[in-house]
Amino acid sequence: MSNSNRPAVVITDSTLRDGNHAVSHQLRASDIASYCQWAEAAHVPIVEVGHGNGLAASSLQVGLAACSDQMMLETARMHLKTSRLGIHVIPGFATVAKDLKPALDLGVDVVRVASHCTEADITERHIGYCRDQGKTVFGVLMMSHMAEVPVLCEEAKKLEAYGAEAVIIMDSSGTYLPLDVTRRVSALKESIGIGVGFHAHNNLGMAIANSIAAIEAGAVLIDGSIRGFGAGAGNAQLETLVAVLERLGVATGIDLYRVLDAGDFAETLFVKELPVVRSLSIVSGLSGVFSGFSKPVLRIASENGVDPRDVFFELGRRRAVAGQEDLILEVVKEIKSRGNR
């Protein structure tokens, strides 16, 4: 079965980027090569590849990747012919000269330049460079729940002014309910003259429902990952997303049978542990803390005899964001100290 009409919604498959969080950034070149062939066969429009935190993020602080950026991108490029190769770029991790230029030289087609939801200013140079090189470039606002709707709209306007061709909001901690998504996507549609996209996490079990709410509110770019493979409780499951959109009559251009096959294959290859909405995932969603914190929080809390739920709620009170993993140990020590008094 195929959904071959002109896509009404363009889906980005983040399996090989967000999914890297689920395996501590240890996806191998062979995993990337094999999965890209399946995604290509399913006619997935955009396949995003890289370290979980994006280009040049491999580090002791957020996790060392099994493969270099160059190896990951070269491998993917070799196997993607019609599907476009995408990357996630956070200024601060990736510089234009040292990281972005070499990535584009390797054949990247789509660049998603991301910032915290109130810091769009840092994306200007990266977005401008991508536009100058003739690449498709989207602006991304991470942890979007941390900004009020008017602030989110103002940040989106900046991305548009810098040259972004669309603005994608990320529910990085999986905290949204469908009404939250509808309000934000609708407001963005009214505020900017470019496309709006949405990236879901499943911490409260709402990834598919939230993605559909985004589309109904006018989003034209939606992210998903095979088997929901991603940080924390995972992302919107790509196969389910395609099936539901087919049921709704929304064209994606993705072959349903082949994406189902891709899911079966990925589960035998590298999705060794299927995403589950566990207790900590729910707490992550409620506290509004980045899903990727789940593993380090659990590990550090366990090592120190501290309840990881307390750690999440304290991180939420401190408005911790991705890249601030060093806060976890600080919070754990503080909670442990209070408990010993």
Swiss-Prot record:
MF GO annotations: 2-isopropylmalate synthase activity; 4-hydroxy-2-oxovalerate aldolase activity; manganese ion binding
Catalytic activities: (S)-4-hydroxy-2-oxopentanoate = acetaldehyde + pyruvate
Source taxon at top rank: Bacteria
Paired cysteines (S-S): none
Gene Ontology biological-process annotations: catabolic process; L-leucine biosynthetic process
Enzyme class, first EC level, given as a word: lyase
Binding site for substrate: 17-18, 172, 199
Protein known as: 4-hydroxy-2-oxovalerate aldolase
Organism placement in taxonomy: Bacteria, Pseudomonadati, Spirochaetota, Spirochaetia, Spirochaetales
